[in-house]
Protein backbone atom coordinates (compact mmCIF):
# COMPACT_ATOMS: atom_id res chain seq x y z
CA UNK A 1 0.00 0.00 0.00
CA UNK A 2 1.32 3.39 -1.00
CA UNK A 3 0.16 6.57 0.69
CA UNK A 4 0.92 10.21 -0.04
CA UNK A 5 1.12 13.26 2.19
CA UNK A 6 -1.82 15.61 1.56
CA UNK A 7 0.50 18.59 2.12
CA UNK A 8 3.24 17.26 -0.15
CA UNK A 9 2.14 14.69 -2.73
CA UNK A 10 5.78 13.90 -3.49
CA UNK A 11 6.21 12.37 -0.03
CA UNK A 12 5.03 8.80 -0.49
CA UNK A 13 5.36 6.00 2.06
CA UNK A 14 4.22 2.41 2.54
CA UNK A 15 1.67 1.29 5.14
CA UNK A 16 4.31 0.34 7.72
CA UNK A 17 5.93 3.77 7.57
CA UNK A 18 2.59 5.57 7.69
CA UNK A 19 1.58 3.59 10.79
CA UNK A 20 4.88 4.29 12.54
CA UNK A 21 5.08 7.99 11.59
CA UNK A 22 1.44 8.90 12.07
CA UNK A 23 1.89 12.21 10.24
CA UNK A 24 3.99 13.25 7.28
CA UNK A 25 6.07 16.40 6.78
CA UNK A 26 4.39 19.69 7.75
CA UNK A 27 1.85 17.68 9.80
CA UNK A 28 0.36 16.32 6.58
CA UNK A 29 -2.12 13.46 6.69
CA UNK A 30 -1.42 10.28 4.73
CA UNK A 31 -3.94 9.19 2.10
CA UNK A 32 -4.02 6.06 -0.14
CA UNK A 33 -2.56 6.40 -3.63
CA UNK A 34 -4.97 3.73 -4.89
CA UNK A 35 -8.57 3.49 -3.75
CA UNK A 36 -9.69 -0.13 -4.21
CA UNK A 37 -13.18 -0.86 -5.53
CA UNK A 38 -15.20 -4.05 -5.09
CA UNK A 39 -17.24 -5.54 -7.91
CA UNK A 40 -20.95 -6.21 -7.21
CA UNK A 41 -20.12 -9.95 -7.08
CA UNK A 42 -17.35 -9.36 -4.51
CA UNK A 43 -19.64 -7.14 -2.46
CA UNK A 44 -22.43 -9.71 -2.42
CA UNK A 45 -19.98 -12.40 -1.31
CA UNK A 46 -18.32 -10.30 1.38
CA UNK A 47 -21.63 -9.27 2.96
CA UNK A 48 -22.37 -12.94 3.71
CA UNK A 49 -19.13 -13.41 5.69
CA UNK A 50 -18.77 -13.19 9.47
CA UNK A 51 -17.39 -9.94 10.89
CA UNK A 52 -13.77 -11.09 11.38
CA UNK A 53 -13.47 -12.76 7.96
CA UNK A 54 -15.13 -9.83 6.21
CA UNK A 55 -12.94 -7.29 8.02
CA UNK A 56 -9.83 -9.23 6.97
CA UNK A 57 -10.98 -9.16 3.34
CA UNK A 58 -11.68 -5.42 3.47
CA UNK A 59 -8.36 -4.53 5.11
CA UNK A 60 -6.39 -6.80 2.78
CA UNK A 61 -7.68 -4.71 -0.14
CA UNK A 62 -5.43 -1.96 1.20
CA UNK A 63 -2.48 -3.71 2.88
CA UNK A 64 -2.10 -7.20 1.35
CA UNK A 65 1.19 -6.18 -0.30
CA UNK A 66 2.77 -5.83 3.18
CA UNK A 67 0.83 -8.24 5.40
CA UNK A 68 -0.44 -11.61 4.19
CA UNK A 69 -4.14 -12.36 4.57
CA UNK A 70 -3.40 -15.22 6.97
CA UNK A 71 -1.32 -13.04 9.31
CA UNK A 72 -3.80 -10.18 9.01
CA UNK A 73 -6.68 -12.47 9.96
CA UNK A 74 -4.98 -13.39 13.25
CA UNK A 75 -4.40 -9.75 14.16
CA UNK A 76 -7.96 -8.75 13.21
CA UNK A 77 -9.28 -11.57 15.39
CA UNK A 78 -7.29 -10.24 18.37
CA UNK A 79 -8.24 -6.61 17.71
CA UNK A 80 -11.97 -7.23 17.33
CA UNK A 81 -12.26 -9.88 20.04
CA UNK A 82 -15.32 -8.27 21.65
CA UNK A 83 -18.94 -8.89 20.64
CA UNK A 84 -19.94 -7.33 17.34
CA UNK A 85 -22.18 -4.26 17.29
CA UNK A 86 -25.90 -4.59 17.92
CA UNK A 87 -28.61 -3.01 15.85
CA UNK A 88 -31.41 -1.59 17.99
CA UNK A 89 -34.67 -0.60 16.29
CA UNK A 90 -36.11 2.75 17.30
CA UNK A 91 -38.98 2.60 14.81
CA UNK A 92 -39.60 1.07 11.39
CA UNK A 93 -37.48 3.67 9.58
CA UNK A 94 -34.67 4.37 12.07
CA UNK A 95 -32.23 2.16 13.99
CA UNK A 96 -29.23 2.80 16.19
CA UNK A 97 -26.06 0.97 15.24
CA UNK A 98 -24.32 0.48 18.58
CA UNK A 99 -20.54 0.58 18.45
CA UNK A 100 -19.87 0.64 22.19
CA UNK A 101 -19.58 -3.02 23.12
CA UNK A 102 -15.78 -3.11 23.31
CA UNK A 103 -13.60 -3.01 26.45
CA UNK A 104 -13.79 0.78 26.87
CA UNK A 105 -17.42 1.14 25.76
CA UNK A 106 -16.79 3.34 22.71
CA UNK A 107 -16.39 2.98 18.95
CA UNK A 108 -12.75 4.01 19.36
CA UNK A 109 -11.96 0.45 20.49
CA UNK A 110 -12.04 -0.73 16.87
CA UNK A 111 -9.36 1.64 15.60
CA UNK A 112 -7.15 1.71 18.68
CA UNK A 113 -6.97 -2.07 19.08
CA UNK A 114 -6.27 -2.62 15.38
CA UNK A 115 -3.52 -0.01 15.46
CA UNK A 116 -1.93 -1.75 18.46
CA UNK A 117 -2.01 -5.05 16.57
CA UNK A 118 -0.45 -3.45 13.49
CA UNK A 119 2.43 -1.99 15.51
CA UNK A 120 3.00 -5.42 17.06
CA UNK A 121 2.96 -7.00 13.61
CA UNK A 122 5.19 -4.45 11.89
CA UNK A 123 7.70 -3.79 14.69
CA UNK A 124 10.05 -6.60 13.72
CA UNK A 125 13.12 -4.86 15.20
CA UNK A 126 11.48 -4.37 18.62
CA UNK A 127 11.97 -0.60 18.39
CA UNK A 128 10.77 1.63 21.23
CA UNK A 129 7.87 3.98 20.55
CA UNK A 130 6.21 6.84 22.37
CA UNK A 131 2.55 7.09 21.45
CA UNK A 132 1.38 10.68 21.98
CA UNK A 133 -2.32 11.29 21.57
CA UNK A 134 -4.97 13.84 22.50
CA UNK A 135 -8.44 12.87 23.65
CA UNK A 136 -11.75 14.64 24.07
CA UNK A 137 -13.02 11.66 26.03
CA UNK A 138 -13.13 8.22 24.44
CA UNK A 139 -9.89 7.99 22.42
CA UNK A 140 -7.78 8.09 25.57
CA UNK A 141 -9.40 5.04 27.13
CA UNK A 142 -9.41 3.04 23.89
CA UNK A 143 -5.72 3.75 23.20
CA UNK A 144 -4.66 3.19 26.81
CA UNK A 145 -6.33 -0.21 27.03
CA UNK A 146 -5.18 -1.26 23.55
CA UNK A 147 -1.50 -0.60 24.36
CA UNK A 148 -1.55 -1.32 28.11
CA UNK A 149 1.40 -3.47 29.18
CA UNK A 150 2.94 -3.61 25.69
CA UNK A 151 6.71 -3.99 25.72
CA UNK A 152 8.77 -1.05 24.34
CA UNK A 153 5.72 1.20 24.00
CA UNK A 154 5.07 4.24 26.18
CA UNK A 155 1.70 5.96 25.82
CA UNK A 156 1.16 9.62 26.76
CA UNK A 157 -2.38 10.95 26.61
CA UNK A 158 -3.34 14.63 26.75
CA UNK A 159 -6.86 15.69 27.67
CA UNK A 160 -8.56 19.00 28.57
CA UNK A 161 -8.87 19.32 32.34
CA UNK A 162 -12.46 19.38 33.59
CA UNK A 163 -13.88 18.83 30.11
CA UNK A 164 -14.35 15.08 30.09
CA UNK A 165 -16.54 13.15 32.51
CA UNK A 166 -15.04 11.61 35.65
CA UNK A 167 -16.06 8.16 34.42
CA UNK A 168 -14.22 8.74 31.14
CA UNK A 169 -11.18 9.93 33.11
CA UNK A 170 -11.22 6.90 35.40
CA UNK A 171 -11.12 4.52 32.44
CA UNK A 172 -7.63 5.60 31.34
CA UNK A 173 -6.08 7.74 34.10
CA UNK A 174 -5.97 4.90 36.63
CA UNK A 175 -3.90 2.35 34.69
CA UNK A 176 -0.28 3.39 35.32
CA UNK A 177 2.62 1.24 34.04
CA UNK A 178 3.33 2.30 30.43
CA UNK A 179 0.29 4.62 30.31
CA UNK A 180 0.97 8.26 31.29
CA UNK A 181 -1.81 10.87 31.35
CA UNK A 182 -1.62 14.67 31.39
CA UNK A 183 -4.54 17.02 31.97
CA UNK A 184 -4.12 20.28 30.07
CA UNK A 185 -5.48 23.59 31.35
CA UNK A 186 -7.28 24.39 28.10
CA UNK A 187 -9.49 22.96 25.36
CA UNK A 188 -9.17 19.80 23.28
CA UNK A 189 -7.95 21.97 20.40
CA UNK A 190 -5.11 23.13 22.69
CA UNK A 191 -4.25 19.46 23.27
CA UNK A 192 -4.21 18.77 19.52
CA UNK A 193 -1.95 21.79 18.93
CA UNK A 194 0.55 20.42 21.46
CA UNK A 195 0.55 17.02 19.71
CA UNK A 196 1.16 18.69 16.35
CA UNK A 197 4.01 20.80 17.75
CA UNK A 198 5.65 17.65 19.07
CA UNK A 199 5.45 16.09 15.61
CA UNK A 200 6.96 19.24 14.11
CA UNK A 201 10.02 18.88 16.35
CA UNK A 202 12.08 16.54 14.18
CA UNK A 203 14.82 16.00 16.78
CA UNK A 204 12.28 15.16 19.49
CA UNK A 205 10.33 12.90 17.15
CA UNK A 206 13.40 10.86 16.28
CA UNK A 207 14.82 10.68 19.81
CA UNK A 208 11.69 9.15 21.39
CA UNK A 209 10.19 7.33 18.37
CA UNK A 210 7.12 9.54 18.39
CA UNK A 211 3.84 8.23 16.98
CA UNK A 212 0.20 9.20 17.30
CA UNK A 213 -2.87 7.07 17.94
CA UNK A 214 -5.43 9.70 17.00
CA UNK A 215 -7.62 9.09 13.96
CA UNK A 216 -4.87 10.79 11.96
CA UNK A 217 -3.13 7.38 12.03
CA UNK A 218 -4.11 5.47 8.90
CA UNK A 219 -4.40 2.12 10.70
CA UNK A 220 -7.17 3.44 12.95
CA UNK A 221 -9.02 4.88 10.00
CA UNK A 222 -8.91 1.66 7.95
CA UNK A 223 -10.22 -0.39 10.89
CA UNK A 224 -13.30 1.80 11.15
CA UNK A 225 -14.33 1.03 7.57
CA UNK A 226 -15.16 -2.51 8.68
CA UNK A 227 -18.15 -1.74 10.86
CA UNK A 228 -19.95 0.12 8.08
CA UNK A 229 -20.01 -3.14 6.13
CA UNK A 230 -21.28 -4.87 9.27
CA UNK A 231 -24.11 -2.34 9.57
CA UNK A 232 -25.06 -2.86 5.94
CA UNK A 233 -25.03 -6.65 6.32
CA UNK A 234 -27.44 -6.51 9.28
CA UNK A 235 -30.30 -4.73 7.51
CA UNK A 236 -32.72 -6.17 4.97
CA UNK A 237 -32.13 -5.83 1.23
CA UNK A 238 -35.17 -3.57 0.99
CA UNK A 239 -33.78 -1.14 3.57
CA UNK A 240 -30.34 -1.16 1.92
CA UNK A 241 -31.73 0.56 -1.18
CA UNK A 242 -32.01 4.03 0.37
CA UNK A 243 -29.71 3.90 3.39
CA UNK A 244 -28.77 7.12 5.19
CA UNK A 245 -26.21 7.05 8.03
CA UNK A 246 -25.96 9.86 10.59
CA UNK A 247 -22.50 10.15 12.13
CA UNK A 248 -21.66 12.10 15.31
CA UNK A 249 -18.56 14.08 14.30
CA UNK A 250 -15.65 15.40 16.34
CA UNK A 251 -12.40 14.95 14.43
CA UNK A 252 -14.38 13.50 11.48
CA UNK A 253 -12.45 10.21 11.40
CA UNK A 254 -15.64 8.18 11.76
CA UNK A 255 -17.26 9.93 8.81
CA UNK A 256 -14.05 9.59 6.76
CA UNK A 257 -14.15 5.82 7.32
CA UNK A 258 -17.79 5.67 6.23
CA UNK A 259 -17.02 7.57 3.05
CA UNK A 260 -14.09 5.21 2.36
CA UNK A 261 -16.53 2.30 2.74
CA UNK A 262 -18.73 3.95 0.13
CA UNK A 263 -15.66 4.48 -2.06
CA UNK A 264 -14.98 0.72 -1.85
CA UNK A 265 -18.41 0.08 -3.34
CA UNK A 266 -20.73 -0.12 -0.33
CA UNK A 267 -23.92 1.50 -1.70
CA UNK A 268 -24.76 3.91 1.10
CA UNK A 269 -27.03 6.57 -0.34
CA UNK A 270 -25.86 9.41 1.87
CA UNK A 271 -24.27 10.47 5.14
CA UNK A 272 -25.20 13.19 7.60
CA UNK A 273 -22.28 15.00 9.25
CA UNK A 274 -23.61 15.73 12.74
CA UNK A 275 -22.02 18.27 15.09
CA UNK A 276 -22.89 20.15 18.24
CA UNK A 277 -22.43 23.92 18.61
CA UNK A 278 -18.82 23.51 17.47
CA UNK A 279 -20.10 23.70 13.91
CA UNK A 280 -17.10 24.62 11.74
CA UNK A 281 -17.97 22.03 9.07
CA UNK A 282 -21.74 22.68 8.83
CA UNK A 283 -21.04 26.40 8.47
CA UNK A 284 -18.40 25.66 5.82
CA UNK A 285 -20.73 23.40 3.85
CA UNK A 286 -23.41 26.07 4.06
CA UNK A 287 -21.29 29.10 3.14
CA UNK A 288 -18.10 27.79 1.54
CA UNK A 289 -16.04 29.67 4.16
CA UNK A 290 -13.75 27.82 6.58
CA UNK A 291 -13.98 29.86 9.76
CA UNK A 292 -13.29 27.91 12.99
CA UNK A 293 -14.52 29.66 16.12
CA UNK A 294 -13.32 29.25 19.68
CA UNK A 295 -14.32 25.82 21.00
CA UNK A 296 -17.28 25.89 23.36
CA UNK A 297 -18.04 23.27 26.02
CA UNK A 298 -21.17 21.17 25.50
CA UNK A 299 -22.76 18.06 27.01
CA UNK A 300 -21.51 16.12 23.96
CA UNK A 301 -17.89 16.76 24.96
CA UNK A 302 -16.23 14.29 22.56
CA UNK A 303 -17.47 16.52 19.73
CA UNK A 304 -16.13 19.76 21.23
CA UNK A 305 -13.67 20.27 18.38
CA UNK A 306 -13.46 23.35 16.15
CA UNK A 307 -10.54 22.27 13.94
CA UNK A 308 -11.27 18.67 12.89
CA UNK A 309 -8.08 16.87 11.83
CA UNK A 310 -9.62 14.56 9.24
CA UNK A 311 -11.49 17.11 7.16
CA UNK A 312 -8.67 17.37 4.55
CA UNK A 313 -9.05 13.61 3.92
CA UNK A 314 -12.76 14.03 3.25
CA UNK A 315 -12.12 16.86 0.79
CA UNK A 316 -9.44 14.76 -0.94
CA UNK A 317 -11.73 11.74 -1.20
CA UNK A 318 -14.51 13.84 -2.74
CA UNK A 319 -11.99 15.31 -5.20
CA UNK A 320 -10.58 11.90 -6.15
CA UNK A 321 -14.00 10.28 -6.56
CA UNK A 322 -15.42 13.35 -8.33
CA UNK A 323 -18.20 13.50 -5.75
CA UNK A 324 -19.92 16.79 -4.97
CA UNK A 325 -19.56 18.05 -1.39
CA UNK A 326 -23.09 19.41 -1.74
CA UNK A 327 -24.29 15.80 -1.59
CA UNK A 328 -23.04 15.51 2.00
CA UNK A 329 -25.88 16.26 4.39
CA UNK A 330 -25.07 18.10 7.59
CA UNK A 331 -26.40 19.84 10.65
CA UNK A 332 -25.63 21.04 14.16
CA UNK A 333 -27.63 20.65 17.36
CA UNK A 334 -27.65 22.80 20.50
CA UNK A 335 -27.45 21.44 24.04
CA UNK A 336 -31.11 22.28 24.67
CA UNK A 337 -32.26 20.32 21.63
CA UNK A 338 -29.92 17.46 22.57
CA UNK A 339 -31.54 17.27 26.01
CA UNK A 340 -35.05 17.22 24.55
CA UNK A 341 -33.97 14.52 22.09
CA UNK A 342 -32.62 12.32 24.90
CA UNK A 343 -36.02 12.61 26.60
CA UNK A 344 -37.78 11.77 23.33
CA UNK A 345 -35.69 8.63 22.86
CA UNK A 346 -36.29 7.64 26.49
CA UNK A 347 -40.05 7.92 26.00
CA UNK A 348 -39.65 5.51 23.09
CA UNK A 349 -37.88 3.05 25.40
CA UNK A 350 -34.27 3.75 24.39
CA UNK A 351 -31.62 5.13 26.75
CA UNK A 352 -29.04 7.04 24.73
CA UNK A 353 -26.35 9.66 25.36
CA UNK A 354 -25.68 13.18 23.97
CA UNK A 355 -23.52 12.28 20.93
CA UNK A 356 -25.90 9.65 19.55
CA UNK A 357 -28.86 11.89 20.38
CA UNK A 358 -27.46 14.59 18.09
CA UNK A 359 -27.16 12.07 15.26
CA UNK A 360 -30.70 10.80 15.88
CA UNK A 361 -32.12 14.32 15.89
CA UNK A 362 -30.60 15.26 12.54
CA UNK A 363 -31.44 11.88 11.01
CA UNK A 364 -35.05 12.06 12.17
CA UNK A 365 -35.45 15.63 10.89
CA UNK A 366 -33.80 15.02 7.49
CA UNK A 367 -34.95 11.48 6.64
CA UNK A 368 -37.25 11.21 3.63
CA UNK A 369 -40.26 8.91 3.44
CA UNK A 370 -38.59 6.33 1.18
CA UNK A 371 -35.31 6.24 3.15
CA UNK A 372 -34.08 4.03 6.00
CA UNK A 373 -31.74 5.59 8.55
CA UNK A 374 -29.03 4.42 10.93
CA UNK A 375 -27.53 6.69 13.55
CA UNK A 376 -24.28 5.60 15.17
CA UNK A 377 -24.17 4.96 18.91
CA UNK A 378 -20.56 5.85 19.59
CA UNK A 379 -20.39 5.50 23.39
CA UNK A 380 -22.23 3.71 26.18
CA UNK A 381 -24.74 6.00 27.98
CA UNK A 382 -23.17 5.16 31.35
CA UNK A 383 -20.00 7.06 30.36
CA UNK A 384 -22.16 10.18 30.67
CA UNK A 385 -24.05 8.91 33.70
CA UNK A 386 -24.40 12.22 35.58
CA UNK A 387 -25.56 14.14 32.51
CA UNK A 388 -27.97 11.47 31.30
CA UNK A 389 -29.46 10.82 34.74
CA UNK A 390 -30.03 14.53 35.33
CA UNK A 391 -31.79 14.97 31.98
CA UNK A 392 -33.89 11.80 32.17
CA UNK A 393 -34.50 12.04 35.93
CA UNK A 394 -33.80 8.33 35.99
CA UNK A 395 -30.85 6.27 37.21
CA UNK A 396 -28.70 4.15 34.91
CA UNK A 397 -26.45 1.32 36.09
CA UNK A 398 -22.72 1.08 35.51
CA UNK A 399 -21.36 -1.80 33.42
CA UNK A 400 -18.49 -3.81 34.91
CA UNK A 401 -15.88 -1.97 32.78
CA UNK A 402 -16.66 1.23 34.69
CA UNK A 403 -17.43 -0.33 38.07
CA UNK A 404 -13.97 -1.91 38.14
CA UNK A 405 -12.25 1.50 37.94
CA UNK A 406 -14.75 3.60 39.84
CA UNK A 407 -12.79 4.03 43.08
CA UNK A 408 -9.22 3.92 41.79
CA UNK A 409 -7.02 7.04 42.19
CA UNK A 410 -6.31 9.24 39.16
CA UNK A 411 -2.62 9.18 38.21
CA UNK A 412 -2.61 12.25 35.95
CA UNK A 413 -0.11 15.09 35.80
CA UNK A 414 -1.31 18.62 35.07
CA UNK A 415 0.31 21.34 32.93
CA UNK A 416 -0.64 24.50 31.08
CA UNK A 417 -0.80 24.30 27.25
CA UNK A 418 2.94 25.02 27.07
CA UNK A 419 4.93 22.96 24.57
CA UNK A 420 8.20 23.32 26.51
CA UNK A 421 6.57 21.76 29.57
CA UNK A 422 5.24 18.90 27.46
CA UNK A 423 8.64 18.43 25.84
CA UNK A 424 10.29 18.10 29.27
CA UNK A 425 7.78 15.40 30.16
CA UNK A 426 8.29 13.54 26.86
CA UNK A 427 12.06 13.49 27.32
CA UNK A 428 11.84 11.98 30.79
CA UNK A 429 12.75 8.30 30.80
Swiss-Prot record:
E.C. designation(s): 4.2.3.1
Record keywords? Amino-acid biosynthesis, Lyase, Pyridoxal phosphate, Threonine biosynthesis
Gene Ontology biological process terms from the UniProt entry: threonine biosynthetic process
Cofactor entry? pyridoxal 5'-phosphate
The protein's annotated catalytic reaction(s) are: O-phospho-L-homoserine + H2O = L-threonine + phosphate
Pfam families membership: PALP, Thr_synth_N
Q: What InterPro entries does the entry give? A: Ser/Thr_deHydtase_PyrdxlP-BS (IPR000634), Thr_synth_N (IPR029144), Thr_synth_N_sf (IPR037158), Thr_synthase-like (IPR004450), Threonine_Synthase (IPR051166), TrpB-like_PALP (IPR001926), TrpB-like_PALP_sf (IPR036052)
- Name its pathway: Amino-acid biosynthesis; L-threonine biosynthesis; L-threonine from L-aspartate: step 5/5
Top-level taxon of origin: Bacteria
Q: Which residues carry this modification: N6-(pyridoxal phosphate)lysine?
A: 108
Cystine links in this protein are: none
Q: Does Protease count among this protein's keywords?
A: no
In its UniProt record, a GO molecular function of this protein is: threonine synthase activity
- Sum up the protein's function in the record's words: Catalyzes the gamma-elimination of phosphate from L-phosphohomoserine and the beta-addition of water to produce L-threonine.
This protein is called Threonine synthase
The species this protein belongs to is: Buchnera aphidicola subsp. Schizaphis graminum (strain Sg)
Query: What is the name of the gene encoding this protein?
Result: thrC
Amino acid sequence: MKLYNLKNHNEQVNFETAVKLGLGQKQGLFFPVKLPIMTPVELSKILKMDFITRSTEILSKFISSEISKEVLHEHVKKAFSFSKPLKICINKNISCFELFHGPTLAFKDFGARFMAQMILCLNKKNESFTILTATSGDTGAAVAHAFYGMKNIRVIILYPKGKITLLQEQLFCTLGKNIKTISINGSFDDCQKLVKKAFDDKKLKESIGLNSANSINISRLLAQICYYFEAFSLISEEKRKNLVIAVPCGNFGNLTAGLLAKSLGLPIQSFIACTNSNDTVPRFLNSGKWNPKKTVSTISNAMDISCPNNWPRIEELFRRKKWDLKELRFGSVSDNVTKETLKELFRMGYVSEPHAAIAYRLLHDQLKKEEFGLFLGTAHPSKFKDTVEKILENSISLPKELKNRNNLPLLSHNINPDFNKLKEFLLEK
